[in-house]
Amino acid sequence: MSKAIIKFVRLSPTKARLIAREVQGMNAELALASLQFMPNRGAKFIANAISSAVANGGFEPEEVVVSSCRVDAGPVLKRFRPRARGTASKIRKPTSHVMVEVSKAQKKEA
């Protein structure tokens, strides 16, 4: 089993979790292929984490399974936008920590 962590990704964790749930339990090669054609911005970061986890273990993508894909909330960058009458409104720019673990696929006995 090997893992990869990408920290401080400028992406909302709620949006990234939608993609992380899709690839969990998938074959790594199939997960990378499906993430390549997803229109979401977070798919690129999760694909990078999966390929990094595969490389960290010294595996080939077709022989491993994404055992866990987790997206945790990172620190929130706070900005202000000037508004009418001298006031300001908050802008929250959330960040995420993407954690991916891959492990060898269990061989099914026939």
From Swiss-Prot:
Superkingdom field: Bacteria
The protein's assembly and partners: Part of the 50S ribosomal subunit.
Coiled-coil intervals, chain numbering: none
Encoding gene (name): rplV
Biased composition (Basic residues): 85-95
Keyword Ribonucleoprotein annotated: yes
Family, per entry: Belongs to the universal ribosomal protein uL22 family.
Gene Ontology process terms (BP): translation
A cellular-component GO term for this protein: cytosolic large ribosomal subunit
GO MF: rRNA binding; structural constituent of ribosome
Keywords: Ribonucleoprotein, Ribosomal protein, RNA-binding, rRNA-binding
Listed SUPFAM superfamilies: Ribosomal protein L22 (SSF54843)
UniProt xrefs under InterPro entries: Ribosomal_uL22 (IPR001063), Ribosomal_uL22_bac/chlpt-type (IPR005727), Ribosomal_uL22_bac/org-type (IPR047867), Ribosomal_uL22_sf (IPR036394)
Function: This protein binds specifically to 23S rRNA; its binding is stimulated by other ribosomal proteins, e.g. L4, L17, and L20. It is important during the early stages of 50S assembly. It makes multiple contacts with different domains of the 23S rRNA in the assembled 50S subunit and ribosome.
Protein name per UniProt: Large ribosomal subunit protein uL22
Region (Disordered): 85-110
